[in-house]
Amino acid sequence: MVNQTHEFLLEMTGVSKEFPGVKALDKVNLNVRPHSIHALMGENGAGKSTLLKCLFGIYEKNEGNILFLGKEVNFTSSKEALESGVSMVHQELNQVKQCSVMDNIWLGRYPKKGFFVDHDKMYRDTKAIFAELDIDIDPKVKVATLSVSQMQMVEIAKAFSYDAKIVIMDEPTSSLTEKEVSHLFTIINKLKEKGCGVVYISHKMEEIFAICDEITILRDGQWVDTRPLKGLDMDQIIAMMVGRELTHRFPEKTNTPKDVILEVENLTALNQPSIQDVSFELKAGEILGVAGLVGSRRTDIVETIFGVRERSEGHIRLHGREMKNRDAHEAINNGFALVTEERRSTGIYGNLDITFNALVANVDEYKTKMGLLSDKKMKSDTQWVIDSMRVKTPSHQTHISSLSGGNQQKVIIGRWLLTQPEILMLDEPTRGIDVGAKFEIYQLILELAKKNKGIIIISSEMPELLGITDRILVMSNGRAAGIVNTKETSQNEILELASRYL
């Protein structure tokens, strides 16, 4: 695919970018070889996105040089970059979902037969690319019918159709199952075999070590180092990313759970397939993890407890009192809070400020006798969220979409703490958050446990569950396969339980 005549396919040297009052990039380097997978890492705000926007011409760099295949380039658009052989597979996929797969691949450059589109050639060419990349998708189906994993594969095939030399992948596995991740890695390795340089952006350390050859680390808009991954360990990478040693990935747990406060007995959701006969107890000050494979219905547990999913039978008792929780409003009044998995779609109101996002779950608390909103109390509570959650922001009027993922998540956790819950349920609380911010979220969770909150955490990251929980409930195909003490269990035992009812 790639005619290899250069040591580096892409050379970005001394790239700087300034905005009014802010130096976003300060002499940053990124050099990508052919036949290699190159990790680009750094905390949120380190400059990764700005660097790539300079490459694609979205931002105009103030200093530095960009060489592609040995020639200086200054792309003015993503389209120009793509047509030149530099492609990006975004975290949020940008496809025409009502069109067919092959339409999406060849959009704007359809093969012609006379005045008409040559659909037969388009089909054959798409099938040929899919065969080369080991992609099993019908080119004629609508993109809307595909899974996220399949949509990503279509984007990779599109890059391949442009004879891309550089393929940039931004958090490509954030919504994929383990099996889908494995298939994606197979396809990425095929690109590598054909001479491509793949730039791989991810917060998941395990993936970086599994697939990448080299790593470039940015911190605070500056280039820290570029090294072969061989010989590096996770602690060294984290230290370079955050500028200090994190001697532990998880804060030390010093809290001892107290008496049982929540009893869940034979919980079954109304609309199946979902959870069936799930039972567990939760103590004050306890952190209960929920593990399971994708499709094990972990999220259904907290949604049923919170009243957004109807139950057909079962009991929920808080301090021995039966809780109906027929909807989310009733659950909130009963002392339950839920931080949802999809932060962008169901957690934040991106175009609104921190005040709105912090207070939206508790609006009635701010109404005066006249029916107006108390500005003083709203400001006070917003400031409490910013201070207690350690949110990094210039102002409470800042749009939440401009904050990093970690700071957005802190605002959402603060929002629910304002409702004064006894039971806090967190679904994938650190997804898409960098390693330094994860540590801060873990600290907040442990502090809440010390205040005798009952905490339930759903996570797909096994080290996270083993690092901060007291016990782990393992789900398998909608049923509870077992509950294990975190200190006494292992990853293998959890995986065995997760497969029990498959």
From Swiss-Prot:
Main subcellular location: membrane
Q: Where in the cell is it found?
A: Cell inner membrane
Binding of ATP occurs at G42, E43, N44, G45, A46, G47, K48, S49
> What residues does the ABC transporter domain cover?
10-245, 255-502
A GO molecular function for this record?
Answer: ATP binding
Reactions catalysed, as given in the entry: D-galactose(out) + ATP + H2O = D-galactose(in) + ADP + phosphate + H(+); methyl beta-D-galactoside(out) + ATP + H2O = methyl beta-D-galactoside(in) + ADP + phosphate + H(+)
Q: Which domain of life, per UniProt? A: Bacteria
- Tell me yes or no: is ATP-binding among this UniProt entry's keywords: yes
Q: Which Gene3D superfamilies match?
A: P-loop containing nucleotide triphosphate hydrolases
* Protein's membrane topology: Peripheral membrane protein
Enzyme Commission designation: 7.5.2.11
Q: Mind listing the UniProt keywords for this protein, alphabetically?
A: ATP-binding, Cell inner membrane, Cell membrane, Membrane, Nucleotide-binding, Repeat, Sugar transport, Translocase, Transport
Query: Is the keyword Disulfide bond in the record?
Result: no
Q: Name one GO cellular component term.
A: plasma membrane
**Function, in words:** Part of the ABC transporter complex MglABC involved in galactose/methyl galactoside import. Responsible for energy coupling to the transport system.
Q: How does it assemble?
A: The complex is composed of one ATP-binding protein (MglA), two transmembrane proteins (MglC) and a solute-binding protein (MglB).
- Family from the record: Belongs to the ABC transporter superfamily. Galactose/methyl galactoside importer (TC 3.A.1.2.3) family.
Q: What is this protein called?
A: Galactose/methyl galactoside import ATP-binding protein MglA
Please give the organism: Vibrio vulnificus (strain YJ016)
Phylogenetic lineage: Bacteria, Pseudomonadati, Pseudomonadota, Gammaproteobacteria, Vibrionales
